[in-house]
Amino acid sequence: MAGEKTRKILVDNRKARFEYEILETYSAGLALLGTEVKAIRAGRANLNDAFARIHHGEVLLYNMNISPLQTAGAFAHDPLRTRKLLLKRREIHKLTGRVEEKGLTLIPLKLYLEGSWVKLDLGLARGKKLYDKREDIKKRETKRDIERAMRR
């Protein structure tokens, strides 16, 4: 179909789903430099320590590491620079109200290509306690044991 855009996931932040309880997700564009887009397409991005904050009505992404390509030479970008996320004004106002609640934060979940655009799935999240993490591990192990028993 002509209007349908393909979605190719480039980076997945699996650690975020373990460390945080995701309440809502938002899709946001990123304001990037040309060398950053090329590096992301080459799979040189890392979301592990990244987080987002709202500052003066803009959503900014911190600590997302995009390693520069060796071919960039003198045009190489700063790998850890702060990047602006592109969201609708309504979404930013909604997020501002929610982030001010105690214990909620913005965590990047996935970095993907939609057509030729690099986009990011942003999650409104609450940190999990240690016992919640242990409970998730137990559920995952019991599910794996059940599937293993069903295959026999």
Swiss-Prot record:
Record-linked InterPro entries: SmpB (IPR023620), SsrA-bd_prot (IPR000037), SsrA-bd_prot_CS (IPR020081)
Location of the protein in the cell: Cytoplasm
Main localisation: cytoplasm
SUPFAM superfamilies with a match to the protein in the record: Small protein B (SmpB)
Gene Ontology cellular-component annotations: cytosol
Cysteine disulfide partners in this protein: none
Listed GO biological process terms: trans-translation
UniProt GO MF annotations: RNA binding
Keyword annotations from UniProtKB, A to Z: Cytoplasm, RNA-binding
One Pfam family from the record: SmpB
Family: Belongs to the SmpB family.
PANTHER family for this protein: SSRA-BINDING PROTEIN, TMRNA-BINDING COMPONENT OF TRANS-TRANSLATION TAGGING COMPLEX
Stated role: Required for rescue of stalled ribosomes mediated by trans-translation. Binds to transfer-messenger RNA (tmRNA), required for stable association of tmRNA with ribosomes. tmRNA and SmpB together mimic tRNA shape, replacing the anticodon stem-loop with SmpB. tmRNA is encoded by the ssrA gene; the 2 termini fold to resemble tRNA(Ala) and it encodes a 'tag peptide', a short internal open reading frame. During trans-translation Ala-aminoacylated tmRNA acts like a tRNA, entering the A-site of stalled ribosomes, displacing the stalled mRNA.
This protein's name: SsrA-binding protein
The species this protein was found in: Gloeobacter violaceus (strain ATCC 29082 / PCC 7421)
Encoding gene, per UniProt annotation: smpB
